[in-house]
A protein has these predicted regions:
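Hydrophobic transmembrane alpha-helices and their helix-loop junctions in integral membrane proteins
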Residues: 1-156, 160-187
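Cytoplasmic/organellar membrane-interface segments at the starts of transmembrane helices
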Residues: 129-131, 181, 189-254
């Protein structure tokens, strides 16, 4: 359920925002007022999400706050009030859904295996289950925006579309987005360090549930593979986002 809520339902609101208001907000009459407000809201959402995630020991709660920050990135693309920015945001929705869905599924697997959501109690999990450590590491790295995963391209396109507008407010928002990316790197690397390295904690030794069922791992492998394919062939997935936005804005212009 957590994977569904974070990977799909949260993003539906962002897409609905573009669908319902995008064509109206790009009108010059509204853009003058809407753009600064959206940019400030985007940056505020990023900081609230990332700074809250940075303080969490509960893995699922950390991922949930991280999702709030991702909505901020999506909102920054919307704040450009351009087709390129809208398309970048829709593309980011796809990439976030894949990766955050993977991480929530993995968090569920760990909870199923050892009965805890505490990162401290997951120390050394990789020594008990290398496959979980590998999947957590790949997913967390991908969420930080490193290539060759798809998140790199959608974040790059959000930055590019924001800078192309030439607005000082959006330029400042991009700088603050980069600061937020550094914050997210800090807590995602904490996940990697905790799970993939170190000696197994006492709680882990006491509660380890043995081998991880393949049926729990296969969906995670599929999702992270889709993220990798998106990064290697970005236009295959970006173009549908462009077409969707074009269809929305064309509908408003009629």
């Amino acid at each position: 359920m957590s994977a569904l809520l974070s990977g799909i339902i949260i993003e539906v609101g962002s897409f609905a925002f573009i669908r319902l208001l995008g064509g109206i907000l790009i009108l010059p009459t509204y853009a003058t007022f809407a753009q600064p407000l959206l940019a400030v809201a985007a940056v505020g959402t990023m900081f609230i999400g990332n700074l809250s995630a940075l303080q969490q020991d509960d893995l699922k709660r950390l991922l949930a706050y991280s999702s709030i920050a991702q909505v901020g990135y999506i909102l920054l693309g919307i704040a450009t009030l351009t087709p390129a920015g809208f398309s970048a945001s829709v593309f980011h929705i796809w990439n976030h859904a894949l990766l955050k869905g993977t991480l929530f599924l993995l968090a569920g697997v760990v909870t199923f295996q050892i009965g805890t959501r505490s990162l401290k109690e997951m120390t050394g999990l990789g020594r008990k289950s290398p496959i979980l450590a590998v999947l957590f590491t790949l997913s967390a790295l991908a969420m930080t925006g490193v290539p060759p995963f798809g998140m790199f391209w959608s974040e790059f396109l959000i930055v590019l579309s924001s800078l192309t507008v030439g607005s000082p407010i959006l330029t400042a928002a991009v700088v603050l987005m980069l600061v937020n990316l550094l914050i997210s790197i800090a807590y995602y690397f904490r996940i990697i360090r905790t799970i993939a390295f170190g000696q197994p904690s006492d709680a882990l030794n006491a509660n380890s549930g043995g081998r991880v069922p393949k049926l729990l791992i296969i969906p995670c492998v599929i999702l992270i593979s889709l993220s990798l394919i998106t990064g290697l062939y970005p236009n295959m997935f970006y173009q549908p986002a462009v077409n969707a936005v074009k269809g929305i804005l064309t509908g408003f212009s009629r």
